[in-house]
Amino acid sequence: MESMLVAGAGAAAVAAVGGLVAAAALADKLVAAPPPRKNRANPPPAVPGLPIIGNLHQLKEKKPHQTFAKWSETYGPIYTIKTGASPVVVLNSTEVAKEAMIDKFSSISTRKLPKAMSVLTRKSMVAISDYGDYQKMAKRNIMIGMLGFNAQKQFRGTRERMISNVLSTLHKLVSLDPHSPLNFRDVYINELFSLSLIQSLGEDVSSVYVEEFGREISKDEIFDVLVHEMMMCAVEADWRDYFPYLSWLPNKSFDTIVSTTEFRRDAIMNALIKKQKERIARGEARASYIDFLLEAERSAQLTDDQLMLLLSESILAAADTVLVTTEWTMYEIAKNPDKQELLYQEIREACGGEAVTEDDLPRLPYLNAVFHETLRLHSPVPVLPPRFVHDDTTLAGYDIAAGTQMMINVYACHMDEKVWESPGEWSPERFLGEGFEVADRYKTMAFGAGRRTCAGSLQAMNIACVAVARLVQELEWRLREGDGDKEDTMQFTALKLDPLHVHLKPRGRM
């Protein structure tokens, strides 16, 4: 979910440049903008920009995390940029990021969302709602009902079936055409989406009647609307976010796209919820997030709208972040046959001829290192969702004024040569030294830190690690010829631009 939020924030910055023609033409209106606050005694260094637009023109390459990291080489781990009328403090080191997320959390606990995300999420989803009573209640519910340790135990069988289905499909495709590369993403995302539906709604929905559409829609269309269209809408941008004093100007194309996406998402989610409420009314209780939320005591805490948004978030998150992590891991494994062999031998020694399960994970240190190294090099969230400084505070010795936006550049934290040797290389061995603990999720910033740590970190590790282990245990992986340098990402997200195509060879029985 958070990768979608970051995509939206980055996209808005780029699209704002396109809106500068209108802004420049209406420069006489700029006097309506509120005067900036008086500079504090010791502000962070500022990246030089242009009048009115600030640094927006420098972010047009659509990889803001890389631009931010480059600037940190000149201006240090903390600096200020201007995105139109908005000052933004960018943090580029783990040390400063943890200071903000843990030590200074009370001053920097709210979210600052672009217009598209405010409309789509209504600030009711766990990942982006402001810290407070509602956010704590919603996070507690998703931890107890779906993502926490005990909840994950009850969904374990579902996860195991999902991974077995992936392997069964891959074996079938290889047997039909052993010499052609196959598209791993197509196979994996289909089963991953089924898992997210079962966990969230209690069943792998094949179709649902949507009253607003006047027809039955298929599972593929459900996926397109709830996952694909939501991701694409997140990169739609409203330049008015960066020029709030011009908010009275129309942006009809943006408003149409967002409202259409919102309408379609709401219609399908409400149809899915209606179907499950009818099941529950018949006394057919199941282990699922919706069954948990609809229990009387918890149901009274939520409006129908909040229920719909929380379930939408749970479906999207499972089908997004885990895909990014697993696909990049298998890309690196296929690209590095020596490391693939090390992992395979570890699995053989630890598990013999038995299929890897979640119980085996503590006995597979190299597998855990592979997982953490992939999170470091290919973080699902290159830049964490923007936060809002609501009280004057200090960071790294600099004064930060209330009203400032703050962005944490996870990419720069993970590419810091002062912390990571040869950070551009994929080297799981770096996580096997004395300085690293497998259980320490804060060695990378991929799951955030402090009170806003990602709620889905345990599920991501359970699914990705077992999937990777089983995939290597049963199949030998080799990249399609010419794909060894295809490491670009899709727009502002961490999703691999080119779906992973691989040659697979079944291994002999162990």
UniProtKB/Swiss-Prot annotation:
Expression by tissue: Expressed in leaf blades and sheaths, stems and panicles.
Keyword Heme in record: yes
Co-factor requirement: heme
GO terms (BP aspect): diterpene phytoalexin biosynthetic process; ent-kaurene oxidation to kaurenoic acid; gibberellin biosynthetic process
Topology of the protein relative to the lipid bilayer: Single-pass membrane protein
Biological role stated in the UniProt entry: Catalyzes the hydroxylation of ent-sandaracopimaradiene at the C3alpha position to produce ent-3beta-hydroxy-sandaracopimaradiene, an intermediates for the biosynthesis of oryzalexin D and oryzalexin E phytoalexins. Catalyzes the hydroxylation of ent-cassadiene at the C3alpha position to produce 3alpha-hydroxy-ent-cassadiene, which may be an intermediate for the biosynthesis of phytocassane phytoalexins. Catalyzes the hydroxylation of syn-pimaradiene (9-beta-pimara-7,15-diene) at the C3beta position to produce 3-beta-syn-pimaradiene.
Enzyme Commission number: 1.14.14.70, 1.14.14.68
Alphabetic keyword roster: Heme, Host-virus interaction, Iron, Membrane, Metal-binding, Monooxygenase, NADP, Oxidoreductase, Transmembrane, Transmembrane helix
Induction of synthesis: By N-acetylchitooligosaccharide elicitor and methyl jasmonate.
Enzyme class, UniProt record, top EC level: oxidoreductase
Chain positions recorded as heme binding sites: C454
GO CC annotations, alphabetized: chloroplast outer membrane
Spans through the membrane: 4-24
Localization (cell): Membrane
SUPFAM superfamilies (UniProt xref): Cytochrome P450
GO MF term set: cytochrome P450 dependent ent-sandaracopimaradiene 3-hydroxylase activity; ent-kaurene oxidase activity; heme binding; iron ion binding; oxidoreductase activity, acting on paired donors, with incorporation or reduction of molecular oxygen, NAD(P)H as one donor, and incorporation of one atom of oxygen
Name of the gene: CYP701A8
Protein name in UniProt: Ent-sandaracopimaradiene 3-hydroxylase
Family: Belongs to the cytochrome P450 family.
Major place of residence: membrane
UniProt feature coiled coil, ranges: none
